[in-house]
Amino acid sequence: MNLFSLLSVSASGMSAQRARAEVLVENLANAETTRTPQGGPYRRKDVVFAAQSQISPFASIYQQELGPHVAGVEVAEVITDTREPERRYIPGHPDADASGYVAFPRMNPAEDMVDLMGASRGYQANVSAMLAVKDMINRALDILR
């Protein structure tokens, strides 16, 4: 693995953490949304990551012995919560049913805030790794001068 592929790994990590943060911010913004264009309350979303595989001719020949070469991380899918919404008794609410109950998203904003902090820290870790690789490349170029 060369230094430039390390930059690619860090860049993919930054991109994945950015996507995770965007989904978490969407969850927080819609924590009290009772009506969506699809009907019903907002459904919480989660990001699922997967390893990117680096396929090279050498790796394809010796993949059995060496194992797959990981080239970063990617967003495999964004899953939507399938649990039943939380029902609250608010009889005067415009979205209340005949019994006076309103369906709200089943989510915990504090949990999403903690996850958002984790995404931010993951992004920062990838930036630090990218800066370290950049420094290594610059030092290697200095040696050649």
Language model features with spans:
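Amphipathic alpha-helical polymerization modules
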Residues: 1-145
